[in-house]
Amino acid sequence: MTDGPCQTCGTYRNPALTVDAVAVRGEGAEREVLLIQRGQEPWKGSWAFPGGFVDEGEDPEIAVLRELMEECNLDGKVRDIISVRGKPERDPRGHVVTIFYSVESDGVPIAGDDAAHAEWIVLDDVKLDKMGADHSEIIRLLQNS
């Protein structure tokens, strides 16, 4: 951990902020979760929640809905925060803090942006070892709720 500004340039090194949309629909054993298959590194080919980086000056709640539209072509409504993850080593791109939002959404997803594929998957059928980053931890939370 570095304390204070960079000795060379004087700027602070702050973590990047990302947001992920956690959309669940249905009841009981029929509950489905919206996932994308990543089309780019890191974790290319693995499954993840739709999401991405918050732009400069952008509200994170707006960013999560933008990412949902870009990656799945779906509208949504932010419900609340499920989790915040930020271990410095969790992302190979550097220190990234992610806000996982519960988002109400429905419809047929159409993959776009850096998503190679998007679909609703029965929650109990999600293969945890195929999830990218630490998203399997959020799937476990959902499966146990």
Named regions from a protein language model:
Residues 100-102, 110-144:
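NUDIX/MutT-family hydrolases
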Residues 21, 81, 101-103:
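A structural signal for short, well-ordered beta-strand segments
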Residues 1-22, 28:
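Acidic, metal-coordinating catalytic segment for phosphate/diphosphate chemistry
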Residues 30-70, 74:
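Conserved Nudix-box catalytic region and its N-terminal flanking loop in Nudix hydrolases
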Residues 85-109, 142:
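Active-site-adjacent beta-strand/loop module that shapes the phosphate/pyrophosphate-binding cleft
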